């Protein structure tokens, strides 16, 4: 049974309250590094990405540098990450697209971001919200799992349905905080196996609604 909008908002706001200082866990110093790091994070932990990116960014600090590298040269820096050969191919192509289509700058709109090789809706939403402060809500595995476990969405909901539901429940200024807090909540409490959410009764207390 999916929660009402009021109850779902209560759950999300309680999760934000549990992790009010949640920040992005990927390391980056500019928009290009953020884009690359988020692309690398697919099916890989942020911790693993953060171990790989210092060497990668030192070797290829700009789209220009990455575009002229070979796929093997890029792959050698990310070989411990999942799907690293595909990611190397996407990074090289994406870097060239940034030069050809966007004067070497990372674009700010979802349509433009999703035109880049290897960039899907989730990556675009992270770059928009974290990199540019543009309201967007990214759905990763933690967010999807939490929303289904807590009946914010139906169990069969797609990532896009999760995204639209949360954006309908919370005001835009809370979307990024909710995304960050849910990642921390998913890692620390709402595990895929043996979630510990029941230790936080405020998540289930709707007596004041």
Q: What function would you assign to each model-found segment?
A:
Residues 2-209:
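Catalytic cores of DNA base-excision repair glycosylases
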């Amino acid at each position: 049974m999916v929660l009402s909008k009021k109850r779902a908002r209560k759950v999300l706001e309680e999760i934000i309250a549990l992790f009010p200082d949640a920040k992005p866990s990927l390391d980056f110093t500019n928009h290009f590094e953020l884009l690359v790091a988020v692309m690398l994070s697919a099916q890989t932990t942020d911790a693993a990405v953060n171990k790989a990116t210092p060497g990668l960014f030192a070797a290829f600090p700009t789209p220009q540098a990455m575009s002229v590298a070979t796929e093997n040269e890029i792959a050698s820096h990310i070989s411990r990450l999942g799907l690293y050969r595909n990611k190397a191919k996407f990074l090289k192509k994406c870097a060239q697209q940034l030069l050809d289509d966007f004067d070497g700058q990372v674009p700010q709109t979802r349509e433009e971001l999703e035109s880049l090789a290897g960039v899907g809706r989730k990556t675009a939403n992270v770059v928009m919200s974290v990199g540019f402060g543009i309201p967007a809500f990214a759905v990763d595995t933690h967010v999807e799992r939490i929303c289904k476990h807590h009946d914010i969405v139906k169990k069969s909901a797609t990532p896009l349905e999760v995204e639209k539901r949360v954006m309908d429940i919370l005001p835009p200024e809370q979307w990024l905080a909710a995304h960050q807090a849910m990642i921390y909540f998913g890692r620390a409490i709402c595990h895929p196996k043996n979630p510990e959410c029941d230790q936080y009764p405020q998540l289930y207390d709707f007596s004041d609604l």
